UniProtKB/Swiss-Prot annotation:
Organism encoding this protein: Listeria monocytogenes serovar 1/2a (strain ATCC BAA-679 / EGD-e)
The enzyme's E.C. designation: 2.5.1.-
Lineage: superkingdom: Bacteria
Molecular function GO labels: ditrans,polycis-undecaprenyl-diphosphate synthase [(2E,6E)-farnesyl-diphosphate specific] activity; magnesium ion binding; manganese ion binding
Coiled-coil positions: none
UniProt protein name: Isoprenyl transferase
Example GO biological process: polyprenol biosynthetic process
Amino acid sequence: MFKKLFRQDENILNSELAEDLPIPRHVAIIMDGNGRWAKKRFLPRIAGHKEGMDVVKRVTRYANAIGIDVLTLYAFSTENWKRPTDEVDFLMKLPVEFFDSFVPELIEENVRVNVMGYRENLPDHTMRAVEKAIADTAHCTGLTLNFALNYGGRSEIITAAKEAMKELELEGKSADDLTEEKLNDHLMSSGLGDPDLLIRTSGELRLSNFMLWQLAYSEFYFTDTHWPDFSKEDFLQAIIEYQNRSRRFGGL
């Protein structure tokens, strides 16, 4: 059944994209608006998060169908611990439910799970679910489904700089030998490449401490659609918009 869904998505999506224009290799998404979606419907915030989890599954299918290599999703920031305890507790249970229900299907479609963030600070049940999903899909070589979980861009840069400096010291080198490449090697996203396209839902025009180093030359796409309402058409529109932009990377 899962393969059939992927094949259907592939046929529909690819038929609407320009064949002679590139698709982004790495797409990152700030999944915003779960709470506002729920409030609009007089539902508790956790209802929005639950609905948002189902959208993650659909968007993963879309990304895999059109040949995207890496899909990075901002799931939980280092600042999100400040939210009400009951909401945080629910959010920490979502990965358990998500991976338990979705990993068998991801394996069938050759999708690898990766999680970047300060995993050591996650609750034990969340950590176990994350580590199991990573281990169970480690052999997969297709799309990398990368979750930013307990992640913060500023902290990541500081951590990477410290680790890079320690490595330089062991090599008998100084701070003058620190390069972008050396720092990049110690980022949590090392090996995944920088995002080509950032999508943010729910109309907010900010990065919220997400991949601050990696987004330096990414194309940004903002939509007013709340994440639980993010559809195949919304995803397609973002990709089409990317295809029609000219990336200069600081040049002419």
